């Protein structure tokens, strides 16, 4: 069996993957590697060439789609799931100490029992009093796992729940005949969908493997417990450990590596980077393409695709504007940035509800969000993708009975749409849609100003004067 990683020119690169045997099906195993470059820096040209990288013309979300190898179609919580762009609920857990882990790298070391909890207690625990005991949630390092899982849920339709039970079943085995054999599927109260363990892999000197994971519907994730020096760093709240973990969870969700250049760096780059914290723009796009935005997990995973399940924005007034989405003007995304929403394709709609307490002039503005950068599949050709111009968005306004009041679809890719409408008190709905099979991040903003209504006495005076003038005209 071919190793999952190989080293060239002092840097670590990955082949296309390793064979994973499951009946007659083969899956790609994905690994995360550490460069010999300084912490926080990428090692070498992201596309793997020593000189200039090969670039070509403008890309579309085909470049995003090409990195989605699979998605979870059955989970312990949901049972059978639906299609791309829809939300899922997954359990994650720590494999019981001693759970067998096969030799994925052909080092002829044979299976080894997981020693991940012991490794975490000794390498990553920042409070020595937090170790020990059966309740892993009391460990000091447990918050690192929660932070990574919660961050994915904040920026996508994936809901992660911790499964505290684990029966010690093998994560995977490596039969003598070759290939790798998956362990059992997740089961509530027994084991998680995504089980995380650790064993010795290839040491911690030079370019080496930090962790690897199997794709969706398998999801087993293994950390190299040799890498004590790297994982013991508490720099920026252990960002190195958290970025590796979040990266591997992306693989467990069916998403593969991305190469990038021109100043754009992403969590799914093949080499570790601690200069940012968590998923970046391209990571969020590919994750939402596969599982939708966080609003898709609302209403028991029905999302906000109809008036009946609309996202309630609240009362719109002079001193209370409303909004949805997060502005994007760069590939860099801060760990505290939340609220990213998107239209997934031509069949996806997002519906938002707002209300008015008095006659008002309402302004509704819809803007696509994104940035331009170079990216491509690992070791492939890099293409420029402008994520501001992936899908042409449209805007519609409905009353409480679902009757269309106004619509805006006047401009093209990358341009905003707006509606200006005088509305009486009541409840209204805004629908956002797209025209093509592309993902598009967007922001929606609503503002209003009260329309002054004349006092009854003033109206009577005006009407009286008008009647007097009419009489005078008749007499003339």
Predicted regions and their residues:
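C-terminal edge strands of extracellular/lumenal beta-sandwich accessory domains
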Residues: 280-317, 350-352, 373-403, 418-452
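Metalloprotease/metallohydrolase-associated module, dominated by Zn2+-dependent proteases
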Residues: 220, 225-226, 230, 256-344
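Metzincin-family zinc-dependent endopeptidase catalytic domain
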Residues: 45-87, 94-99, 129-135, 139-260, ...
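Extracellular beta-strand-rich recognition modules
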Residues: 223, 362-366, 428-434
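N-terminal secretory signal peptides that target proteins for export/translocation
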Residues: 1-17
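A short, hydrophobic C-terminal helix/tail in secreted or cell-surface proteins
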Residues: 454-472
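Bacterial N-terminal signal peptides
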Residues: 19-31
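Non-catalytic, beta-strand-enriched accessory regions in extracellular/secretory proteins
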Residues: 322-363, 371-378, 414-419, 427-429
């Amino acid at each position: 069996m071919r190793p999952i990683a190989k080293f060239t020119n002092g840097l670590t690169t990955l082949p296309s993957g390793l064979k994973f045997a499951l009946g007659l099906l083969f899956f790609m195993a994905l690994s995360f590697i550490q460069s010999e470059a300084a912490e926080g820096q990428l090692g070498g040209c992201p596309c793997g060439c020593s000189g200039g990288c090969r670039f070509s013309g403008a890309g579309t979300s085909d470049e995003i789609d090409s990195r989605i190898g699979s998605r979870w179609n059955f989970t312990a919580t949901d049972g059978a799931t639906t299609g791309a762009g829809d939300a899922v609920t997954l359990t994650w857990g720590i494999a019981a100490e001693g759970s067998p882990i096969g030799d994925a790298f052909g080092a002829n070391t044979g299976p080894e029992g997981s020693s991940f909890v012991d490794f975490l207690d000794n390498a990553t625990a920042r409070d020595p009093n937090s170790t020990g005991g059966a309740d892993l949630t009391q460990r000091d390092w447990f918050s690192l796992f929660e932070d990574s899982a919660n961050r994915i849920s904040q920026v996508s339709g994936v809901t992660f729940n911790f499964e505290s039970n684990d029966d010690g079943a093998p994560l995977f085995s490596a039969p003598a005949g070759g290939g790798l054999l998956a362990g059992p599927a997740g089961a509530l109260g027994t084991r998680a969908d995504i089980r995380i363990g650790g064993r010795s892999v290839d040491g911690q000197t030079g370019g080496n493997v930090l962790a690897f994971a199997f794709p969706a519907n398998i999801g087993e994730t293994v950390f190299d417990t040799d890498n004590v020096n790297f994982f013991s760093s508490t720099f920026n709240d252990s960002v190195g450990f958290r970025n590796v973990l979040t990266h591997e969870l992306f693989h467990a969700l069916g998403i593969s590596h991305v190469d990038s250049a021109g100043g754009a760096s992403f969590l799914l780059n093949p080499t570790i980077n601690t200069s940012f914290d968590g998923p970046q723009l391209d990571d969020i796009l590919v994750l939402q393409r596969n599982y939708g935005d966080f609003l898709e997990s609302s209403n028991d995973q029905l999302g906000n695709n109809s008036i009946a399940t609309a996202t309630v924005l609240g009362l719109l007034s002079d001193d209370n504007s409303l909004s949805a989405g997060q502005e994007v003007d760069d590939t860099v995304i801060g760990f505290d940035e939340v609220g990213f929403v998107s239209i997934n394709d031509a069949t996806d709609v997002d519906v938002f509800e707002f209300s008015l307490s008095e006659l008002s002039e309402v302004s509704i503005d819809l803007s696509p969000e994104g940035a331009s950068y170079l990216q491509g599949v690992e070791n492939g050709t890099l293409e420029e993708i402008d994520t501001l111009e992936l899908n042409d968005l449209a805007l519609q306004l409905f009353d409480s009975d679902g009757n269309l009041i106004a619509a805006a679809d006047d401009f093209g890719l990358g341009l905003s749409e707006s509606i200006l409408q005088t509305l009486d008190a009541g409840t209204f709905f805004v629908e956002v849609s797209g025209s093509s099979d592309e993902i598009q991040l967007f922001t929606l903003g609503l503002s209003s100003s009260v329309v002054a209504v004349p006092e009854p006495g003033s109206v009577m005076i005006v009407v009286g004067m008008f009647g007097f003038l009419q009489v005078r005209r008749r007499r003339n």
